[in-house]
Amino acid sequence: MITAFATQQTLDHLQLYSAFLNRESDASGTVVLHHGRVKRPGKQVPEFSTVELKPLVDDVDERLAAIARSAKDKHRLNQVLVVHRLGIIQACDSVLLAIVSGKTRDICFDACAWIVDEVKKEEFIQLIEH
């Protein structure tokens, strides 16, 4: 199963993780997650006041889903969830949640890292520090 979307709403990472686990079966031996948060100092503005996450395309949800599908196929995962914040957010706010499940930890760690690297290329969501 693949769940992927962008949202202006605050990420409820615990609810998303709980829902993910409720969809799991005994085919998964490992669940790995990445919970990305906005940190200081910033990359462009060390002491930024806000961060803007701006969509660069109209189909952000489909782009996230494509990354999730690629990870699922490439790493033979059982389930993938990718959720990305949009809009104006603060330091310490959650920006990205990626959760994967599969048979073994090595494929799950590799897949989760690959998803984060793909999203961080900023090809369809731009991060602007103010």
Which residue stretches match the model-derived regions?
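N-terminal, polar/charged subdomain of small-to-medium soluble alpha/beta proteins
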Residues: 1-94, 101-130
